[in-house]
């Protein structure tokens, strides 16, 4: 019974994070768990997600 309860708690807590992923954010970026190598971090979204924008920072 405990494993089933743990699964339900995990799914309940994970749902808000999934709703925030791939949302548009600052400077037309996208919220992700981690930016790709070809993207730069410009801000943070909710739940410690990173707001990623394509391209490299200006020198």
Swiss-Prot record:
Keywords: Antibiotic, Antimicrobial, Defensin, Disulfide bond, Secreted, Signal. Disulfide bonds join 25-51, 31-45, 35-52. GO terms for biological process: defense response to bacterium; innate immune response. Transmembrane segments: none annotated. GO terms for cellular component: extracellular region. Residues 1-19 form the signal peptide. InterPro entries: Beta_defensin_dom (IPR025933). Has antibacterial activity. This is Beta-defensin 134. It comes from Pan troglodytes (Chimpanzee). The gene is DEFB134.
